[in-house]
């Protein structure tokens, strides 16, 4: 089925023929739904809710860890284009009317003075039309304002990445999300006066990000007395996936070549694997707030970091005991209790295993990457949720699931997903080294059966696209996972331009 030209194309992308065959098989078979035990909650022990005393202890733990000079990295997926933020404004440009009609359009134009980009927008409008934004509104020339915001003749926001848009107003100058993440790194992810920030970006925007960092980094280093090491990576072509026709034959471009598409954020497990660090914080590019509201974010990030360090210490100590061979059955039982109670990983019949089998089981389960994930109370926002799920080896563990991973024909599962008490704001702290200080090879811990297939089109032709297991979903399926309740104030994503008018972004 694959031609000589196909094989050359595959090789040039760094993809093996076996991987392409595997992807075609996944298209044919589809992906199994996950088997759920329950939505994770505080009541069933799936989500931690630390007491004030415990919080203080974990915060102190994190500050001690920072003082030890460990390498902490802030990892920010930032390849997302801003075009979706402006979907309603693009629709307004194409609308048969010239003045704002919808509630969204009216809210935008009524509040143009509130946006952090207002001065740049006004400057662009004046340079081209000799009229300010206010003048253009009074003259009913609303679409010209939008063109200057979104188009190349103006700010070009319709084609820029989210990370480079002006989000927040300050007395000296407005800030982009990129800058807010640099500040966050200095506030909770620094060690010995140095902080590391890694952005994953698209190839087309890489230079723009580098230019912005070069322009701004010194300002924030001085303001926070912290040396900022900023690095970038792109999604690897070798993680692209083959698109197929509805009949599962390879979809071909007009020139006859195979169509490969980016495999979604799950591909970033390869980028994360390349990061050199002891602990990695992960948060999306658009979930930032101005300085006056950063307090909750900083405190809760430190809290998650402290919980991670606390759990790592105990895990590493147990693994060292197993290496010495002088352990007792009582110690093994204590490790099982820790694994089940603290790391929420359970399997029936473990107590019946003999010592050798139990040690093998404990080694396998304890010696894994660990992540501590913040979870916020469910207020109906779209996104994944925390669940207790059954794994192929018979264990039950914590997973972050998307709706696409749940059988929509199973009423009990759908109810559990809809009625879950918490949801995933993408707020993770990850331990990516083992108890001997070696980096884990993260692709070894991916569940390749947790991707999904979506329907897309190209040039008017339908196709099936293969999404890799999501970064915080199947790509981290075989990690030790702990969920911790964090306040809703730490979750402030910007999905539309009008979200910037919310109090938390003003």
Predicted regions, residues:
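C-terminal, active-site-flanking charged/polar segments
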Residues: 280, 300, 390-425, 434, ...
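Long, compositionally biased intrinsically disordered regions
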Residues: 2-42, 353, 359-366, 371-373, ...
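Domain-scale recognition of functional cores that engage charged ligands
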Residues: 8-10, 29, 37-379, 388-400, ...
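Conserved catalytic alpha/beta cores of large enzymes that bind or transform nucleotide phosphates
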Residues: 131-140, 153, 157, 286, ...
